[in-house]
Amino acid sequence: MSEHVPADEAPEPRLITETGLDRRIADIIEPVIVELGFELVRVRILNQNGMTLQIMAERKDGTMTVEDCEELSMAISPVLDVEDPVDKEYHLEVSSPGIDRPMVRASDFTRWQGNLLKCETSILIDNRKRFRGKIADVTPDGFILERDQVAYGEEPRLTIPFTALAEAKLILTDDLVRDALRADKQAKAAAEAANQNDETGEDQ
């Protein structure tokens, strides 16, 4: 079971949030997700299997097990039944963000620095709104993108402010898979060590 999060431990805000009905659903379910010790990544209504309400979430260390998904689904379902934001029948799908994940928090860019991503901005930057390249560095206000395909006259590196992001997603590569497996292994090892420390403390 997940541990409840103290009220003073506010979750890191998302840089990219939903609009319309997706936003309303996010506002309804995010307090439940946070209370159980998870972070909301994205809410999206998809026209598949009739209608699917897709909710992506994860722990603060980036992990998300099948049991975690089941726990969140059981906690979210009754809240959605009461609030009833969707006036049609739908299938609820709770999942991890996946390896080629959406990037929605500043910490995502720090965690996955060095990997390729594609992103879209809400304003023109260097006469473009769509970019692809490596996360070369991260600053408090944005990140430096190193383009993997540089057109004539373009700068190979440019700074993209977090406030200008409309969408961002990692690109699946062998390096990303390797980094994701390593991060998952480290997170599980840290969780096991924490559990052992808790058990040792209880025995004393």
UniProtKB/Swiss-Prot annotation:
This is Ribosome maturation factor RimP. Pfam families: DUF150_C (PF17384), RimP_N (PF02576). InterPro entries: Ribosome_maturation_RimP (IPR003728), RimP_C (IPR028998), RimP_C_sf (IPR036847), RimP_N (IPR028989), RimP_N_sf (IPR035956). It is found in: Cytoplasm. One of its GO terms (biological process) is ribosomal small subunit assembly. NCBIfam families: PRK00092.2-5. Required for maturation of 30S ribosomal subunits. Gene3D superfamilies: RimP-like superfamily, N-terminal (3.30.300.70). Its main location: cytoplasm. Belongs to the RimP family. GO terms for cellular component: cytosol. The keyword rRNA processing does not apply. Keywords: Cytoplasm, Ribosome biogenesis. It comes from Allorhizobium ampelinum (strain ATCC BAA-846 / DSM 112012 / S4). The gene is rimP.
